[in-house]
Amino acid sequence: MSDNSQKKVIVGMSGGVDSSVSAYLLQQQGYQVAGLFMKNWEEDDDEEYCSAATDLADAQAVCDKLGMELHTVNFAAEYWDNVFELFLAEYKAGRTPNPDILCNKEIKFKAFLEFAAEDLGADYIATGHYVRRQDVDGKSRLLRGLDGNKDQSYFLYTLSHEQIAQSLFPVGELEKPEVRRIAEQLDLVTAKKKDSTGICFIGERKFRDFLGRYLPAQPGPIMTVDGQLVGKHQGLMYHTLGQRKGLGIGGTKEGGDDPWYVVDKDLDSNTLLVAQGHEHPRLMSVGLVAQQLHWVDRQPVTAPFRCVVKTRYRQQDIPCTVTPLDDERVDVRFDDPVAAVTPGQSAVFYQGEICLGGGIIEQRYPLTIPA
């Protein structure tokens, strides 16, 4: 028998292919494996209900096929209190939050971890995230997933080394096509299911309609950086820096046919500022200040250091220098200007394959425009 035969792992089963294959891989490694389906949202229309019901049915079908038990739990109250209300408050303040990061912090690696350990007697939890864990000198590190296209460490930077030590990430060592191939070989119902792209647990729905249910939209003007009125927006909360689609405005004589991009939001006047060209100076930043810091090793940063940073998911690594301002904030200076650095989003730091941690972008340092 393997050393793992006495260890119980609870896999967060989403009804997707990654968690399905994770469960199978853990069985192959000799663990005692069971699944947990988390219900984190109280559906309020038929379409949402059907989507959630399909995910649960798929998770159950996979567990039946693999001969393992599936537990269910309702974390809707925790999700509302600890993720959704903060998400709405950030939008209301004109920032663009990342709910997946909050959800991982508060639900998957807190509520789920506690429930699995205390109620189900788990030694570990496991998820279908594309990240890797490395244990060095008694501390667990978070590494990027092997598949660079799918690496999800950006979403998990808030985890501590203690949380990582209680977590397993079986597909983090694989590339996505291999995961699908395993699912097809096993004839799992999730083998060809497309990856979800919706907001965390809120699923695939029209974001504008969804946000409009909870926050009153305030239409206002769309102005160019030169002060020209070019259109009307339906609410600042529907727009984010660097956004190109959905503005409903064409080119101008001076700017030619270059597409328009959102370069700023003026909350005081409820104005959306736009400029033409994806590298317009108003869109570029030379650095940022990050707050609400989380370092994976939980050691505060006391001296400047060099690393790379990502200011959004799947962005290329940006070489930078990080300087602590105090225990809660760091100053980050990029080697070269970066487009669309967005307050409310996360800045996540890496050294090589290791995810060091990150923080919320509080402000950006704009590229100064020559007079």
Curated annotation (Swiss-Prot):
The family database entries (InterPro entries) matched by this protein are listed as: MnmA-like, MnmA-like_C, MnmA-like_central, MnmA-like_central_sf, Rossmann-like_a/b/a_fold
Question: Do you know which Gene3D superfamilies this protein is assigned to?
Answer: Adenine nucleotide alpha hydrolases-like domains, HUPs, Translation factors
| Keyword Transferase applies | yes
Any one of the GO BP annotations: tRNA wobble position uridine thiolation
Q: Where in the cell is it found?
A: Cytoplasm
Keywords attached to this Swiss-Prot or TrEMBL record, sorted alphabetically, are:
ATP-binding, Cytoplasm, Disulfide bond, Nucleotide-binding, RNA-binding, Transferase, tRNA processing, tRNA-binding
Positions of the region Interaction with target base in tRNA?
Answer: 98-100
Binding positions for ATP? 12-19, 38, 128
Note the SS bond partners.
Answer: 103-200
For the site Interaction with tRNA, which positions are given? Answer: 129, 345
Query: EC no.?
Result: 2.8.1.13
The record's GO molecular-function terms, alphabetically, read: ATP binding; tRNA binding; tRNA-uridine 2-sulfurtransferase activity
Task: Name the active site residues.
Answer: 103 (nucleophile), 200 (cysteine persulfide intermediate)
Q: Which reaction does it catalyse?
A: S-sulfanyl-L-cysteinyl-[protein] + uridine(34) in tRNA + AH2 + ATP = 2-thiouridine(34) in tRNA + L-cysteinyl-[protein] + A + AMP + diphosphate + H(+)
User: What's an example GO cellular component term for this entry?
Assistant: cytoplasm
- In its keyword annotation, does this UniProt entry include Cytoplasm? yes
Q: Residue ranges of region Interaction with tRNA?
A: 150-152, 312-313
In the record, the note on similarity to other proteins reads: Belongs to the MnmA/TRMU family.
PANTHER family referenced in this protein's UniProt entry, alphabetically? MITOCHONDRIAL TRNA-SPECIFIC 2-THIOURIDYLASE 1 (PTHR11933:SF5), TRNA 5-METHYLAMINOMETHYL-2-THIOURIDYLATE -METHYLTRANSFERASE (PTHR11933)
Record function comment: Catalyzes the 2-thiolation of uridine at the wobble position (U34) of tRNA(Lys), tRNA(Glu) and tRNA(Gln), leading to the formation of s(2)U34, the first step of tRNA-mnm(5)s(2)U34 synthesis. Sulfur is provided by IscS, via a sulfur-relay system. Binds ATP and its substrate tRNAs.
* Assembly and binders: Interacts with TusE.
Q: What is the protein's name according to its record? A: tRNA-specific 2-thiouridylase MnmA
- Organism of provenance: Yersinia pseudotuberculosis serotype O:1b (strain IP 31758)
